[in-house]
C-alpha cells in the first residue's frame, strides 16, 4: 500500500520540537466508528515487524479527559466486539495545525480501567487483526476437516477462507499458476494455518493486515525500482544514535534448494532427438485426452536445447513451456527432466530432483562470492521444501533465502525522534556515520514510544539496486 506523505507531514518530521496528542476511535466489526476516547498518554508503544504475519501491536495507558463510564462489560464502551483505531497527532508549527496519522486497527486485549477520586485511566494491549484468524480471538475450524484441492486458484481459495471469519476487506494478488498440491487442515486448526499454507505455495508472498484493517496477499517488497521516501534531509534532524551489527554465523552467500523428488506417470522405452524435438516411445500412453487430462512424463535429454518440443509416439509434437507460457530451456546435457501434460501442452517442471540455486554475485555486496570470503553455502531440503515442485519455484525460493542470509545481515539500527507515517518495506536513503556516501535501505521493523518525549527504534537492511527482484 503506497504511503500518502503530504508536505505538512514531511515538515513535521523535521521539527526538533514536538507536541503530541493521541486519539482512539472505537470501531465495530464493520469498521464503523461508534465512539471515541481522548486522553493524555502516560505510557505506550507501537510496534511493526515486516517479518511477522502479526505485523502490528501496541500497548497504551492514558489518563482520560472525561469522567465517562469505561466499565469493561458486555454492551460497554470497551468489550470483545470492539476494535480500536489509534491516531497520533503532532502540532505543525508552520501550518499552526495538527497533523494526524493512522497507526492501525487493533483488537483490544487485557483492558484495565482505574477510576477513583484521583484517577481515571485506561490501559490495554492492541493485538494485530490476525488474532481473529489464528485462534487468539477466533479463527478455529470447528465443523469438519477442510481440503483445498490441487489445481485450485489460490486467490479464490483465500477469498473463500476469509469468508469463513467474515473478513470482507482484502486486496489479493493473483499467482500465475494453480495450487500444485492438496492443502488440508483438521478440526481444531486455525483459519490462519490454512491461509499461511496457501501463502507458502510461493515463498516470495506475504499476508498481513494494513493500517486500515485490509487483509493483503502480495509479493514481499524487495525495493526493486522503488524511490527513496526519506533521506538525510530528515535524518540529520532527528537521528540520535546508530548501530551496525552483522551475524557472521547466519551469513550464507550461496543457497541450494532441493525440492520435491518427482515420480513421473510415464517413462519412455526409447528416446530420439531431432533438432529441438524429443520423440518418446511410451507403450501405455493415453490415446484420448480431454480438458481434465493431466499426467507427468519423464525423459533424459542428451543435449541442452532451448524452446523444445515433445512428441510422444505418433501424436503431434507439443511445445514444452514454463507455467507462465514462455518457452522452456533444458539447460543440462544428459539430465533427466519431468514435464506435466495439461490442456494440450507440456508444462516444464524441472529435474527429477527439483533444484534451484542462488549466489550473491553482486560486487557491491559485502558478501560477494568473488570477494576474499569466497563461497559460504547452505543446502536446504526436506520439510516445507518438499512442496516445491518446479525448478523455477526452487530458484525463486533460493533467491529469497539468499536475501534472508545476506541482506538481512547487512543492516543498521537507528534511534530517532518518531516518524509516525513510517512503514515497513519502504526504501529510504541514509548516510551511515562512518561514511560520506548515502546508502539505500529497506525498513524492516520499528518500535516507537508514544509519550511526549518518546523515541523510535528502526531496523533497516541494505538495498542494492544491482540485485534483481526476488
Predicted regions located by residue number:
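Exposed extracellular interaction/assembly regions and N-terminal maturation sites
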Residues: 265-315, 347
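Short acidic/polar beta-strand-loop edge motifs in secreted extracellular
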Residues: 45-47, 133-159, 172-197
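Short alpha-helix capping/helix-loop boundary micro-motifs
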Residues: 59-74, 280-281, 321-327, 410-417
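Short coil-to-beta transition motif at edge beta-strands of beta-rich domains
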Residues: 75-94, 290-296, 420-431
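Acidic, glycine/polar-enriched metal-coordinating patches/loops
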Residues: 303-350
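Acidic, small/polar-enriched beta strand-loop surface segments
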Residues: 1-32, 196, 200, 205, ...
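Short coil-to-beta-strand transition motifs
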Residues: 96-106, 332-334, 432-442
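Assembly/oligomerization scaffold segments
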Residues: 1-142, 184, 195-204, 208-211, ...
Amino acid at each position: 500500500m503506497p504511503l500518502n506523505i503530504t508536505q505538512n507531514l514531511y515538515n513535521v518530521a523535521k521539527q526538533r520540537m514536538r507536541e503530541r496528542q493521541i486519539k482512539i476511535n472505537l470501531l465495530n466489526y464493520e469498521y464503523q466508528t461508534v465512539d471515541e476516547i481522548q486522553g493524555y498518554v502516560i505510557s505506550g508503544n507501537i510496534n511493526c515487524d515486516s517479518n511477522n504475519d502479526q505485523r502490528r501491536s501496541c500497548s497504551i495507558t492514558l489518563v482520560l479527559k472525561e469522567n465517562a463510564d469505561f466499565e469493561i462489560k458486555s454492551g460497554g464502551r470497551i468489550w470483545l466486539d470492539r476494535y480500536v483505531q489509534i491516531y497520533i497527532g503532532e502540532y505543525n508549527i508552520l501550518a499552526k495545525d495538527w497533523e494526524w496519522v493512522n497507526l492501525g486497527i487493533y483488537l483490544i486485549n487485557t483492558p484495565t480501567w482505574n477510576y477513583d477520586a484521583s484517577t481515571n485511566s485506561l490501559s490495554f494491549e492492541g493485538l494485530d487483526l490476525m488474532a481473529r484468524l489464528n485462534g487468539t480471538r477466533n479463527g478455529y475450524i470447528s465443523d469438519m476437516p477442510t481440503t483445498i484441492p490441487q489445481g485450485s486458484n489460490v486467490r479464490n481459495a483465500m477469498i473463500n477462507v476469509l469468508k469463513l471469519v467474515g473478513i470482507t476487506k482484502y486486496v489479493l494478488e493473483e499467482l500465475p499458476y494453480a495450487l500444485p498440491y492438496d492443502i488440508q487442515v483438521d478440526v481444531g486448526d486455525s483459519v490462519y494455518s490454512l491461509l499461511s499454507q496457501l501463502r507458502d505455495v510461493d515463498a516470495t508472498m506475504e499476508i498481513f493486515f494494513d493500517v486500515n484493517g485490509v487483509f493483503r496477499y502480495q509479493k514481499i517488497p524487495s525495493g526493486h525500482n522503488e524511490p527513496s521516501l526519506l533521506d538525510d534531509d530528515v535524518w540529520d534532524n532527528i537521528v540520535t544514535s546508530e548501530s551496525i551489527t552483522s551475524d557472521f554465523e547466519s551469513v550464507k552467500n550461496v543457497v541450494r534448494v532441493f525440492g520435491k523428488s518427482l515420480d513421473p506417470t510415464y517413462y519412455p522405452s526409447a528416446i530420439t532427438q531431432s533438432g529441438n524435438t524429443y520423440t518418446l516411445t511410451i507403450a501405455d500412453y493415453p490415446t484420448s485426452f480431454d480438458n481434465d487430462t493431466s499426467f507427468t512424463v519423464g525423459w533424459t535429454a542428451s543435449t541442452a536445447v532451448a524452446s523444445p518440443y515433445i512428441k510422444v509416439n505418433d501424436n503431434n509434437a507439443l511445445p514444452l513451456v514454463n507455467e507462465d507460457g514462455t518457452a522452456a530451456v533444458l539447460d543440462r546435457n544428459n539430465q533427466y527432466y519431468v514435464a506435466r501434460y495439461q490442456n494440450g501442452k507440456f508444462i516444464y517442471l524441472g529435474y527429477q530432483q527439483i533444484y534451484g540455486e542462488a549466489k550473491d554475485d553482486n560486487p557491491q555486496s559485502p558478501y560477494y562470492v568473488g570477494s576474499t570470503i569466497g563461497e559460504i553455502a547452505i543446502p536446504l531440503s526436506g520439510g516445507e521444501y518438499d512442496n516445491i515442485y518446479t525448478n523455477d519455484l526452487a530458484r525463486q525460493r533460493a533467491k529469497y533465502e539468499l536475501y534472508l542470509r545476506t541482506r538481512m545481515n547487512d543492516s543498521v539500527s537507528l534511534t530517532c525522534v518518531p516518524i509516525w507515517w513510517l512503514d515497513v518495506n519502504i526504501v529510504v536513503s541514509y548516510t551511515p556515520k562512518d561514511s560520506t556516501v548515502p546508502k539505500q535501505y529497506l525498513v524492516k521493523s520499528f518500535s516507537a514510544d508514544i509519550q511526549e518525549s518518546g523515541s523510535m527504534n528502526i531496523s533497516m537492511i541494505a538495498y542494492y539496486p544491482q540485485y534483481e527482484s526476488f
